[in-house]
Amino acid sequence: MNYIFSGIFLYFFLCFLLYIFQRRIVFNKSGHPGAPKDYNLANTEEVYIKTEDNLKLLSWYHKGNNSLPLLVYFHGNSFHIGDRAYRIQKYIEKNWSVLLVSWRGFGGNEGNPTEKNLYKDAEAVLKWIKNNTEFKFKELVIYGESLVSGDAVEMGTK
């Protein structure tokens, strides 16, 4: 009988811990990525995307051939943009334009990542593309990994 009560107690204790630490589990932040040259990303520059609540989000931009699409890549949870450099390397080699976006709270960026705030970040990315590139929204390829795949889908509907 003690085993049953111990098992029930352990179950509820684990549920309690999951509840308490759910934000850390879902929004597992990462450190600063370094510079694009550290990842052999040729002709890729650091850009800062300003959000409506005045945060500056570090992102990397490679300007390629304007006749090819712009790949907008949103990294997933527990990563920063440097961790995903290998995934965009092939597009840069084919001379695509690439914007590798880092979210608030990730990659050394300030801010608190929440679902609402990640949507704000996606809106800021759209505005940055409109104001700083020649691409039209129909020429974008939007890739959202893991945590931010929903934000990428939302961005694609705009």
Language-model features, listed with the residues they occupy:
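Aromatic pocket-lining residues of Rossmann-like dinucleotide-binding sites
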Residues: Y91, M155-G156
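Glycine-rich nucleophile elbow surrounding the catalytic serine of serine-hydrolase chemistry
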Residues: G144-E154
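Alpha/beta-hydrolase fold nucleophile elbow
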Residues: F135-S146
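An N-terminal hydrophobic leader/cap segment in hydrolases
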Residues: Y3-K50
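A generic structural signal for alpha->beta connector loops
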Residues: N43, N54, N95, F137-E139
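Solvent-exposed polar/charged
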Residues: Y19, T157-K158
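Membrane-embedded segments
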Residues: E52-N132
